[in-house]
Amino acid sequence: MTTVQSKYSYALPAAGLPPQTERFADRAIFTNAYAFIPRTVMTDIVTSSLPFWEKTRLWVIARPLTGFSESFSHYIMEVSSKGGSDRPDDNISSEHVLFIVDGSIELEYNDSIHSLQSGNYAYLPAGLSWRLHNSKNKKAVFHWIRKRYDEIEGIQRPTPFITSDEAVKPVSMPDTDGVWQTSMFVDPTDIRHDMHVNIVTFQPGGLIPFAETHVMEHGLYVLQGRGAYYLNGDWREVEEGDYMWLRAFCPQACNAAGTEPFRYLLYKDVNRHMPLHL
């Protein structure tokens, strides 16, 4: 399977390292309700590596933390030419979403190889054997969101699929005239899925007109544009490449600014009973 390059633009980590002449001033903050990780702090010296991944580095921007956000991890993966893995994750209980933002990769599962470009989205269920490689002469960058799949007796696991940002028609929120839209890569009524990773789009001036306060944990990576985001009583100026990591019940709202759409990749946990143990 070969896919088509996306018409959308996607922010990448800053990488590199600020010069010694740079005056320290940044927006990063970690609170008991949310973390705000600006693009400017995603430099070379905060990357990591993974077992059995060749010519690859990653920024870890979310991981399960007791008493904070506990359900998922979020990596930004950078795979150099001829890099990748035949053994990407030994945890057979983890499910995966991959969203490509630069370059291209070859994703192999069920005896088929799929060439994914910027804007492609892949869902890989728990227990699936898969491989990923970059055969091109430039690096590939993608988001990798992992969650332990919550098995339910009598409900089958979801099946793997590949789609794209362009292929999914955004759904407008009620009474917003298309100013606030969500691209849903999974049918929200499909109870097999216990996480959704969507793209939310606001046109300039669009807003969330109330403080959303709910049980879902969130990871929000700004793909494009800028705005002001309300988080647990604080207003934060956000722009492409910034990341917001929210625990359950963190109040949130936003107001899109600038002259281009404000778009972010959004993780949330869904469709399961609340655990009655800590």
Predicted regions mapped to residue ranges:
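C-terminal functional regions that serve as terminal interaction/effector modules
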Residues: 2-25, 29-32, 210-213, 217-224, ...
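Conserved short histidine dyad/triad with adjacent acidic residue
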Residues: 55-64, 73-92, 183-186, 198-214, ...
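Short acidic-glycine-tyrosine-enriched beta hairpin
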Residues: 110-126, 233-248
